[in-house]
Amino acid sequence: MTPVPVSVDTTADFAAPPTKTAPSTSTRTLLLAPPSIAAHEEKLRDIFATFDRASTDLQMLDRLSAGFVSLPAATYDLVLVLTDTDSARRAEALQLLSRDVYSALVPSMKGGAKLQLQDGTWNSAEGLEAILAGLVEKDGAFEKPAYQEAAVPLRLGGKKKKAPAPTEQPPVATGVGFVDGNDELIDEDDLLSDDDLKRPMQQPANCQPEKAKKRRRPCKDCTCGLAAEMEAEDKARQEKADKDLNVLKLQSTDLSDEVDFTVQGKTSSCNSCSLGDAFRCSSCPYIGLPPFKPGEEVKILNNMVQL
């Protein structure tokens, strides 16, 4: 007999009907409720009758303010603060919308998402924290700006700037503005004759010193001769004073002189040195010294006795 081929049925004996999945929506809503609304179940029932529970989240403002709840980033298209239609809970809700709440709320909003109140629009004073958080007021609500990212090309190593071309200088005439150090200088005294040099110098009236007043000081760049004249007077006065101070000083030639009062027959003009007593004459160079011993050699150096 010829073998008969056998086929295996691989189909399932029981096929369940395909389940219908609800179409996913990209719009999500966040409801922020004050703590007092939890005691009114009918309020929550009415709210969820308006919003789809599958795409709506409910959070309590007090828990969000305390940091017990963390919101997903860039998720919600609408944030609605439940204040009741008659504004019964407006003050309670706005009091809980602190800076910490906005710090957690704004990052969870998508670009272009809105923040609204259930009972109406915001007042100017109520939206200060929202503005500080980066939201923009629009049509009685606050909207998060939709920032777009764009790549900006950065050019590195740009072209080097060309050096400016040198400007042409106008031609300068020869011999103008130049000083030649090899030129011979003329002595001004050669231009004066002997009579001009013997003629007394005439001082200007401004430089002549007044007799009744103090001596006039010469100018810093004096050219009338007053400075040289006063310098000569000061030099002569200094030389005279130095000469008066050197009256009592011995010259270097006097160092070789020796005085010996121990030689027999030598006496002073006052005849007191031979008495064997101390020198007491006021003009004696040995005043105050004890009498010399026989044979002692004495020298005078710069008016000082050298024994």
Swiss-Prot record:
Q: Where along the chain is [4Fe-4S] cluster bound?
A: C270, C273, C281, C284
Comp. bias intervals (Low complexity): 15-26
Report residue spans for region: N-terminal SAM-like domain. 23-152
Q: What is its main location?
A: cytoplasm
| Keyword Iron-sulfur annotated | yes
Q: Which InterPro entries match?
A: Anamorsin, CIAPIN1, Dre2_N
**UniProt keywords, alphabetically:** 2Fe-2S, 4Fe-4S, Cytoplasm, Iron, Iron-sulfur, Metal-binding, Mitochondrion
Motif window: Cx2C motif 1: 270-273
Extract the ranges annotated as region (Fe-S binding site A).
Answer: 207-224
Motif Cx2C motif 2: where in chain: 281-284
The UniProt annotation puts the region (Linker) at: 153-197
Q: Which Pfam families match?
A: CIAPIN1, DRE2_N
Spell out the residue ranges making up region: Disordered: 1-26, 159-179
Required co-factor(s) are: [2Fe-2S] cluster; [4Fe-4S] cluster
The organism's superkingdom is given as Eukaryota
Q: Does the keyword Isomerase apply?
A: no
Q: Which GO terms describe its molecular function?
A: 2 iron, 2 sulfur cluster binding; 4 iron, 4 sulfur cluster binding; electron transfer activity; metal ion binding
Compartments, as annotated in UniProt = Cytoplasm; Mitochondrion intermembrane space
Transmembrane stretches in the record are none
Ranges where the record places region Fe-S binding site B: 270-284
GO CC annotation terms, alphabetical: mitochondrial intermembrane space
State the function annotated in the UniProt record. Answer: Component of the cytosolic iron-sulfur (Fe-S) protein assembly (CIA) machinery required for the maturation of extramitochondrial Fe-S proteins. Part of an electron transfer chain functioning in an early step of cytosolic Fe-S biogenesis, facilitating the de novo assembly of a [4Fe-4S] cluster on the scaffold complex cfd1-nbp35. Electrons are transferred to dre2 from NADPH via the FAD- and FMN-containing protein tah18.
For domains, the record's comment is: The C-terminal domain binds 2 Fe-S clusters but is otherwise mostly in an intrinsically disordered conformation. The N-terminal domain has structural similarity with S-adenosyl-L-methionine-dependent methyltransferases, but does not bind S-adenosyl-L-methionine. It is required for correct assembly of the 2 Fe-S clusters.
Q: What family does the entry list?
A: Belongs to the anamorsin family.
- What name has this protein been given in UniProt? Fe-S cluster assembly protein dre2
Biological source species? Aspergillus terreus (strain NIH 2624 / FGSC A1156)
Where is the organism placed in the taxonomic lineage, from the top? Eukaryota, Fungi, Dikarya, Ascomycota, Pezizomycotina
Gene that produces this protein = dre2
